[in-house]
UniProtKB/Swiss-Prot annotation:
Pfam families: CN_hydrolase. It catalyses: formamide = hydrogen cyanide + H2O. This is Cyanide hydratase. Gene3D superfamilies: Carbon-nitrogen hydrolase (3.60.110.10). It comes from the Eukaryota. One of its GO terms (biological process) is cyanide catabolic process. One of its GO terms (molecular function) is nitrilase activity. Oligomer of dimers, forming left-handed helical fibers.
Length: 356
């Protein structure tokens, strides 16, 4: 499918989430979708784990301290087949806008770092999970499986993809996205402290500036994509909610001002937001600009040697229990997107919801 729109306006969210409060998180999500719609945007990108906010406390606590916070976080995470998700999908429909949404997904007893791509009709075009939680994130989140790996989809605003946090640094994830001809990318980031907090031996890669100004433009250059980097911000009240009892409170400003948007040649396209800025970063996208960069270096095409270097990708779901298919032979698999209820068209989901 060729894109219908080659030129359009897009937005990246640079704002504070509704910390560990599902209802407030949904309200803020719909608010920013509405604001992007009013501004004439065709696409809006949210940060990693926007709902219900990134659990930054996990970097500060020991096991015992984590348990009350972990319980609250789980209680305020978002089930995919829920009234809250349908409200967000309906907001996308009302504004006729594509939405890349990052959230903590409840699936049975586990949580996952999930992204969905919602269409202007409110249907789910892509459901993916971060393939590996980073370091202490494994205290909270499980890993994605084969059928939640895909990040790039064809839409009428181009081939659009999204990844979470350090997936944007992963050379294999970038190579896979490049092979699919990605044109517009969401590098979704959570909450990161600034470089002024860095203490050896913590590496520089673990501060905001490294990811905002090195990792993100590198993704744009290497894939030839418009790369939107939505980012979470935090206030003094948010710091309190993220700080376990007995821990020192930090200055919220060290976390803010890192939202970015880069062109397919790596140029910064928007001014760096002020530390106190909360809102949307806007960009005018022209898909033909991608061709200029890709004509020089298309690592998914003419500038690669698959006869020498190839990447093996397995997109099959790995189930804990596998059932034999006695009719067709082999085994039966249930797609994750079907099992969590996201493949149901919004019209049907709304009807079922109204009947219950």
């Amino acid at each position: 499918m060729a894109p219908v729109l080659k030129k359009y306006k897009a937005a990246a969210v640079n704002a504070e989430p509704g910390w560990f409060n599902l209802e407030e998180s949904v309200r803020r999500t719909i608010h920013w979708i509405d604001e992007a719609g009013k501004a004439g945007c065709k696409f809006i990108a949210f940060p990693e784990l926007w709902i219900p906010g990134y659990p930054y406390w996990m970097w500060k606590v020991n096991y015992q301290e984590s348990l009350p916070l972990l319980k609250k976080y789980r209680e305020n995470s978002l089930p995919s087949d829920s009234d809250e998700m349908r409200r967000i999908r309906n907001a996308a429909r009302a504004n006729k806008i594509y939405v890349s949404l990052g959230y903590s997904e409840v699936d049975l007893a586990s949580l996952y770092t999930t992204q969905v791509m919602i269409s202007p009709s409110g249907d789910i075009l892509n459901h993916r999970r971060k393939i590996r939680a980073t370091h202490v994130e494994r205290l909270v989140f499980g890993d994605g499986t084969g059928d939640t790996t895909e990040s790039v989809i064809q839409t009428d605003i181009g081939r659009v993809g999204h990844l979470n946090c350090w997936e944007n640094m992963n050379p294999f994830m970038k190579a896979y996205a490049a092979s699919l001809g990605e044109q517009v990318h969401v590098a979704a980031w959570p909450l990161y402290p600034g470089k002024e907090t860095l203490k050896y031996p913590d590496p520089f890669t673990n501060v905001a500036e490294a990811n905002a100004d090195l990792v993100t433009p590198a993704y744009a250059i290497e894939t030839g994509t418009y790369t939107l980097a939505p980012w979470q911000t935090i206030t003094a009240e948010g710091i309190k909610l993220n700080t376990p009892p007995g821990k020192d409170l930090e200055d919220p400003h060290i976390y803010n001002g890192h939202g970015r948007i880069f062109g397919p040649d790596g140029q910064n396209l928007v001014p760096h937001p002020d530390k106190d800025f909360e809102g949307l970063l806007f960009v005018d996208i022209d898909l033909d600009e991608c061709h200029l960069s890709k004509s020089l270096a298309d690592f998914g095409g003419h500038y690669m040697r698959p006869d020498l270097i190839r990447l093996l990708v397995d997109t099959n779901r790995k189930d804990l229990v596998v059932r034999e298919d006695r009719v067709n032979g082999g085994v039966e698999y249930t797609r994750t997107v079907d099992r969590v209820g996201l493949s149901t068209p919004l019209d049907i989901a709304n009807t079922v919801d109204s009947e219950n």
